[in-house]
Regions:
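RNA-binding accessory domains that recognize and position tRNA/RNA substrates
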Residues: 2-193, 198-218
């Protein structure tokens, strides 16, 4: 498969829930995730970010959008999210995964850089995660011999990550840190006094991080 540089680089955002959500009971977790999805949709609507689908699978959200980088940066401010990764989506076929990794490596790696590949899978596939990593590394070194690239599994300049989920695969090289905490709106409202300058604002922000919508009082 030959990939064109004119093709949009990222078409998906992998949205990871905050760790606190994962340790809740099934009923509470479902409630929190539902609220989080509502908050994500509200942010996308507020910034007029187009998207085709927002799917919850395997304890994550997968946002299909042609504005993946912009969406990830805006959503990183949503309480309840731990991190977000603009990603390329493809099928779970080994050849297509490797082709996408080589394409992304060509855009991200510079002369003399080191790199690593990591792979995580959910489901049954005719290959192992280690086989994916070895093939990705081999093909990248083969594709860009003039860059003087090297593999470094401890402190690479660029890490190419592959997540295989049943019949789909997602390739990315970045993770944008989220603010964590709980989804805004899962706790009762609180009154926040804004007369104490920066300290009052910080206290209000921390209350929001615990899921409490603020009632601002000047």
């Amino acid at each position: 498969m030959r990939l064109s540089l004119a093709e949009p680089l990222f078409d998906t955002v992998i949205v990871r829930f905050g760790g606190e959500i994962g340790i809740k009971g099934a009923w509470t977790r479902k409630l929190y995730e539902r609220r989080l999805i509502e908050n994500v949709r509200a942010v996308l609507k507020h910034y007029a970010i187009p998207y085709n689908a927002l799917v919850r699978r395997f304890g994550r959200l997968y946002l299909k959008t042609p504005s993946a980088w912009d969406a990830a940066k805006k959503l990183s401010r949503v309480f309840g999210l731990s991190s977000l990764s603009p990603a390329l989506e493809t099928t779970s076929k080994m050849g297509e995964i490797v082709d996408k990794c080589v394409y992304l490596a060509g855009l991200r790696l510079k002369k003399g850089n080191s790199f690593a590949a990591k792979c995580r899978r959910v489901g049954k596939h005719p290959y192992t995660s280690q086989e994916v990593c070895r093939e990705v590394g081999r093909r990248i070194l083969e594709a860009y011999p003039l860059l003087g690239l090297r593999v470094d599994l401890t402190r690479p300049n660029v890490t190419l990550a592959v997540e295989v989920r049943e019949d789909r695969a997602f390739i990315y090289a970045d993770a944008i840190q989220g603010v964590g905490g709980l989804p805004l709106g899962v706790q009762p409202r609180v009154v926040c006094l804004l007369k104490g300058g920066a300290r009052s604002a910080a206290a209000c922000w921390l209350a929001m991080k615990r899921g409490c919508p603020p009632i601002l009082v000047h």
